[in-house]
């Protein structure tokens, strides 16, 4: 998504990243919600007055089911808009990003909140009535709940398009050292914090698999990698691999430079 290119620099003219991180504890990523919102308003300034609220995808689906709006805490923390220490929206960040108050009118609620029953229209369509309860709507938040290890020293690795490596804490860590090391603080169930690093997962392979139109399966690609004697390495954490026009060409360019 090229819309957010340079948006971080614009925000830092008003609020330094060090100050932003000390509040929200979220590592800088070009896809963070705060950057997307600023980019959206630059492209569509009319949304500032026309939009009644904003909902992330899980909460929007819940709204379609019930007709009731809410912002779920674990999901909202990932967008660099929340105060990680006070478990609320950050007025400082919202003001610096010049985001309208009307977008934040729905309540900010913890996972496990009963949102309400299915709307009459939905209940009639599915043939039954049910109560909708918000889980930890951020996927990593719910994935973590399935991990059997629960002792304080346990580390976890949640792998998919991205890999999340970290541990669960009772309080966020928003120090300069944590910021410089690229750690992020995501809200978790039961007022916990997932202190983790977002590292490259299957994203590069997914892009390459799509580009070659599935000529090789993922298993075959892994086998080719294991048997390769190619002498060079690439840095999978390089931002050049986040959204290139061609992942294959970007990898080739990186190897040539190496």
Where are these regions (language model features)?
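Active-site core segments that coordinate phosphate-bearing ligands/cofactors
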Residues: 12-25, 35-70, 81-96, 120-258
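Nucleotide/phosphate-binding loop and acidic/charged catalytic motifs
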Residues: 1, 71-76
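A conserved helix-loop-beta module that forms one wall/lid of the active-site cleft
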Residues: 91-113
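Short alpha-helix plus adjacent loop in nuclease-associated cores
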Residues: 1-14
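Short glycine-rich phosphate-binding loop at a beta-alpha junction
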Residues: 29, 52-54, 107-108
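Conserved short loop/turn motifs at secondary-structure junctions
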Residues: 25-28, 76-83, 109-113
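Glycine-rich phosphate-binding loops at beta-strand->alpha-helix junctions
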Residues: 110-118, 163
């Amino acid at each position: 998504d090229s819309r957010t290119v340079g948006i971080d620099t614009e925000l830092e003219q008003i609020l330094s990243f060090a100050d932003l991180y000390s509040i929200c504890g979220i590592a800088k990523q070009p896809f963070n919600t705060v950057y997307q919102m600023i980019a959206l308003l630059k492209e569509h300034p009319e949304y500032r007055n026309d939009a009644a609220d904003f909902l992330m995808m899980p909460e929007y689906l819940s709204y379609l089911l019930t007709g009731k709006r809410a912002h779920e805490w674990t999901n909202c923390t990932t967008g660099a808009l929340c105060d990680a220490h006070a478990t609320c929206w950050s007025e400082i960040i919202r003001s610096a990003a010049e985001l309208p108050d009307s977008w934040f009118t729905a309540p900010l609620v913890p996972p496990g909140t009963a949102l309400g029953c299915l709307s009459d229209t939905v209940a009639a369509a599915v043939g039954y009535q049910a109560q909708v309860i918000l889980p930890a709507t951020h996927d990593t938040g719910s994935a973590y709940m399935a991990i059997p290890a629960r002792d304080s020293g346990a580390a976890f690795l949640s792998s998919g398009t991205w890999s999340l490596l970290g541990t669960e804490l009772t309080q966020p860590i928003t120090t300069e050292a944590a910021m410089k090391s690229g750690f992020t603080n995501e809200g978790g169930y039961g007022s916990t914090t997932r202190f983790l690093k977002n590292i490259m997962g299957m994203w590069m392979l997914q892009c390459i698999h799509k580009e070659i139109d599935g000529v090789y399966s993922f298993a075959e690609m892994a086998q080719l990698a294991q048997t390769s004697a190619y002498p060079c390495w690439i840095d999978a954490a390089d931002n050049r691999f986040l959204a290139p026009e061609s992942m294959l060409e970007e990898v080739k360019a990186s190897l040539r430079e190496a």
